[in-house]
């Protein structure tokens, strides 16, 4: 019972904090009338609590046409290149895994090349004759506990806000529950490898589709890590405009597989 009381107090503090952030940023927006500036500040302040809240805000805003494509892409880039610090790296586990599986990290153990909401990404090379380049995807340290706390705060807030009629109009609870389930699936690395294998099998006859091959043994021993082959490519938002049509046709074919 004591734990539930503490949890509810934390959730109330979270709700009050978020309401203060939104309220203060709305006041600043009322003064400067700069929507892009408003989104930037709001994003950074939500991320300082938990990056998950940025993802939920993005889904809510997009679902209710509160942001345009340009702003949505900006938020996508933010969540795909999320802030991180050294406390997010489980250094002991990363060093132990790389030593056991003979992987060299040329940029060191404290320099990820990318940071998502759930994981940090490192470049590595196998210590053998092939010197094959690999990607090491590692969950942020204590991410499961942080996500659980964030989700509990959100669900508690949805319950409180459900008593306000205007909130129901924006289907906020539906957006939160949908995204919470998606995010929970992203923390299961064995399931992610299963999905990669399934897609690779389904697309084996599509020459233009390349799916990384993951070392399942690594993840079975270190559930917070995926080691996979590196594939050169570009992000979808980096595709030249004159290639949109041909790329779209390939995406449609891929979707039909």
Regions found by a protein language model. Give the residues of each.
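Broad phosphate/nucleotide-binding scaffolds in NTP-utilizing and phosphate-metabolizing enzymes
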Residues: 1-256
């Amino acid at each position: 019972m004591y734990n539930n009381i503490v949890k509810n107090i934390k959730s109330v503090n979270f709700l009050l904090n978020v309401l203060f952030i939104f309220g203060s940023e709305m006041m600043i927006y009322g003064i400067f009338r700069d929507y892009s500036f408003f989104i930037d500040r709001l994003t950074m302040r939500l991320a300082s609590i938990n990056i998950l809240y940025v993802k939920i805000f993005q889904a809510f805003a997009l679902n209710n046409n509160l942001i345009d494509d340009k702003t949505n892409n900006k938020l996508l880039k933010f969540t795909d290149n999320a802030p991180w610090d050294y406390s997010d790296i489980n250094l002991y586990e990363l060093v132990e895994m790389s030593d056991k599986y003979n992987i060299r990290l040329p940029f060191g153990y404290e320099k990820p090349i990318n940071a998502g909401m759930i994981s940090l990404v490192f470049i590595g090379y196998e210590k053998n004759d092939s010197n094959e380049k690999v990607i090491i995807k590692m969950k942020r340290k204590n991410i499961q506990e942080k996500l659980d706390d964030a989700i509990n705060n959100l669900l508690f807030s949805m319950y409180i806000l459900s008593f306000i009629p205007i909130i129901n109009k924006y289907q906020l609870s539906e957006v939160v529950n949908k995204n919470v389930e998606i995010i929970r699936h992203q923390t299961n690395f064995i399931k992610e490898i299963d999905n990669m294998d399934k897609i690779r099998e389904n697309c084996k006859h599509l020459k233009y589709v390349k799916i990384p091959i993951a070392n399942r043994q690594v993840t079975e021993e270190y559930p917070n890590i995926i080691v996979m082959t590196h594939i050169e490519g570009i992000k979808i938002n980096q595709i030249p405009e004159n290639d949109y049509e041909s790329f779209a046709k390939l995406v449609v074919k891929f979707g039909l597989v």
